[in-house]
Swiss-Prot record:
It comes from Bacillus cereus (strain ATCC 10987 / NRS 248). It catalyses: N-formyl-L-kynurenine + H2O = L-kynurenine + formate + H(+). Zn(2+) 1 binds at residues 50, 54, 56, 173. Zn(2+) 2 binds at residues 56, 161, 173. Gene3D superfamilies: Putative cyclase (3.50.30.50). GO terms for biological process: anthranilate metabolic process; L-tryptophan catabolic process to kynurenine. It comes from the Bacteria. Substrate binds at residue 20. Catalyzes the hydrolysis of N-formyl-L-kynurenine to L-kynurenine, the second step in the kynurenine pathway of tryptophan degradation. Binds 2 zinc ions per subunit. The lineage of its organism: Bacteria, Bacillati, Bacillota, Bacilli, Bacillales. Belongs to the Cyclase 1 superfamily. KynB family. Homodimer. This is Kynurenine formamidase.
Amino acid sequence: MKTSEWIDISQPLNNDIATWPGDTPFSYEVSWPKEESGSVNVGKLTMSIHTGTHIDAPFHFDNEGKKVIDLDIQVYVGPVRIIDVSNLESIGKKELENFNLEGVERLLLRTSSHGKVNEFPDVIPHLHADIAPFLSEKGIRLIGVDVPSVDPLDDKELEAHHQLFKHGIHILENVVLDHVADGDYELIALPLALTDADGSPVRAVIRPI
């Protein structure tokens, strides 16, 4: 692979992809086939915003929070560092203190805890709320994880979500990192221009720098 090639770190979206229990299942179908239209196939997509690789907006957990269209899209494009934090049940300031994060603006955490896009996990590693001020002090503006949430799956307080955005840190979830090495990359993970949404699916890609 050439170093200039982009590497996809997104979960493929298809009718078998796992969704949050109780949330809208993913569905794609050709609703207007070429045989009927005379010229084209037209598809219909039904999905939850939080299926597959996606970003969260504050409106997801705060009725007064910013929606996707209000977010700074510059945060989702630029240099990123991938680090390995596998075999940890939770990740906070203590777990990251020994990593060199100087000059890092975007950080992706490889937990290698699940990896089965067609099965929703029962338990995931989660982030401690104290990670937010720690990352903010380092100048980090985006945190990404390879699991569906930065908080425990059964948590209702979503303290990590709240503290991350309180400290100016954007959230990217469900990236796929098992096929890429630790190190520095360029990231593109742009959300759609959804005016009223609490999140957005993204096509997240990286390339070495």
